[in-house]
């Protein structure tokens, strides 16, 4: 792939010596209204990335260590941790290499830097796609466990889970390769945005339906104990709060990135859209933050996993 300047990339470029430079095909010399540009210090970005790496490595180690966690649900959580780990590692690696290039501490031929850029971009894009896929897979798994509880173990078997996991990884690698190869096509950006919207709708529909079932179940229990309102309202408020946090964090962390992609299609040269483009480094930081939060939402709430995690930490000392 030929070098086309510092902003030729879908997910950033090592040809730009500043890690805070606009990415995703931005017009660097746009003129227009005064914009609010929130820069993220390199040290903070690298620090968040390292925190995410440590957290997700611990999740993978805990699930690998405890055989009681070798079930489809925890395998999906483990794969989500691996995806978040790859997002963090690749983003930190890209920023570190760019800083080294800027400082002159890393010298290399343009072809070598170009090849490394290609590899990192495919890794970042594939990890993002797989992370979204496994968030959807976890939602589907929980939905089946609630609405088909008696048949859950016959529906979600280990072979089926492994086939689903393999399909997600293969699809993520292939799609990310195509996305990077055809980064300058509008269809690529539309596919990414459509994929995000589909995952958001899927998760919202499934979790809202699960909340409705939980409230219905609570009403049934309340009638038996003749205290309908307190029990039902308490569970409903708790469930609604949990749902709001889960979907809110997902949308807050991923939404700006895909808004960025949408505006690239709708108004790539409009001055106001250019103001959004200048904050891409912040949007990538939010995705790293999502990788930090995911273990707390999906993994650390399990008492069995927390116990195993303590054992892993004690063994490491």
UniProtKB/Swiss-Prot annotation:
UniProt keyword annotation of Membrane present: yes
Top-level lineage group: Eukaryota
Transmembrane segments: 38-63, 73-93, 119-140, 164-183, 192-211, 241-266, 280-300
Cytoplasmic-side positions: 64-72, 141-163, 212-240, 301-317
One Pfam family cited in the UniProt record for this chain: 7tm_1
Glycosylation sites: 15, 29
Keywords of this entry: Cell membrane, G-protein coupled receptor, Glycoprotein, Lipoprotein, Membrane, Palmitate, Receptor, Transducer, Transmembrane, Transmembrane helix
GO molecular function: melanocyte-stimulating hormone receptor activity
Lipidation (S-palmitoyl cysteine): 315
Main location: membrane
Record Gene3D superfamilies: Rhodopsin 7-helix transmembrane proteins (1.20.1070.10)
Single GO BP term: adenylate cyclase-activating G protein-coupled receptor signaling pathway
Location of the protein in the cell: Cell membrane
GO CC annotations on file: cytoplasm; plasma membrane
Recorded topology in the membrane: Multi-pass membrane protein
Extracellular side: 1-37, 94-118, 184-191, 267-279
Function of the protein: Receptor for MSH (alpha, beta and gamma) and ACTH. The activity of this receptor is mediated by G proteins which activate adenylate cyclase. Mediates melanogenesis, the production of eumelanin (black/brown) and phaeomelanin (red/yellow), via regulation of cAMP signaling in melanocytes.
Subunit organization: Interacts with MGRN1, but does not undergo MGRN1-mediated ubiquitination; this interaction competes with GNAS-binding and thus inhibits agonist-induced cAMP production. Interacts with OPN3; the interaction results in a decrease in MC1R-mediated cAMP signaling and ultimately a decrease in melanin production in melanocytes.
Family: Belongs to the G-protein coupled receptor 1 family.
Name the UniProt record assigns to this protein: Melanocyte-stimulating hormone receptor
Species this chain originates from: Felis catus (Cat)
Lineage: Eukaryota, Metazoa, Chordata, Craniata, Vertebrata
